[in-house]
Amino acid sequence: MPKEEVLEFPGVVTELLPNAMFRVKLENEHEIIAHTAGRMRKNRIRVLTGDKVLVEMTPYDLTKGRITYRFK
């Protein structure tokens, strides 16, 4: 099965939510709820309020996403 087309957007973490979820404001002013990718969890990369992140989303649900990268 081919991998689905994913959309990537840069954003800023605005709020930390329970269960390792984050509220992220994208550059196009949309707010979504995102969780960290498994690789970030495994390597214990911390994400805090105000961090610039890269969010990966599926075209089917544009309200949820996965944080795949934290910019330095």
Swiss-Prot record:
Subcellular location: Cytoplasm
Keywords: Cytoplasm, Initiation factor, Protein biosynthesis, RNA-binding, rRNA-binding
Family matches, as PROSITE patterns: S1_IF1_TYPE
Tagged with keyword Transport: no
One MF annotation (Gene Ontology) recorded for this entry: ribosome binding
CDD domains associated with the record: S1_IF1 (cd04451)
SUPFAM superfamilies: Nucleic acid-binding proteins
UniProt cross-references to Pfam families, sorted A to Z: eIF-1a (PF01176)
GO cellular component: cytosol
Domain S1-like: 1-72
Subunit structure: Component of the 30S ribosomal translation pre-initiation complex which assembles on the 30S ribosome in the order IF-2 and IF-3, IF-1 and N-formylmethionyl-tRNA(fMet); mRNA recruitment can occur at any time during PIC assembly.
Family as reported in the entry's similarity comment: Belongs to the IF-1 family.
PANTHER family named in the record: TRANSLATION INITIATION FACTOR IF-1, CHLOROPLASTIC (PTHR33370:SF1)
Cited function: One of the essential components for the initiation of protein synthesis. Stabilizes the binding of IF-2 and IF-3 on the 30S subunit to which N-formylmethionyl-tRNA(fMet) subsequently binds. Helps modulate mRNA selection, yielding the 30S pre-initiation complex (PIC). Upon addition of the 50S ribosomal subunit IF-1, IF-2 and IF-3 are released leaving the mature 70S translation initiation complex.
Protein name per its UniProtKB record: Translation initiation factor IF-1
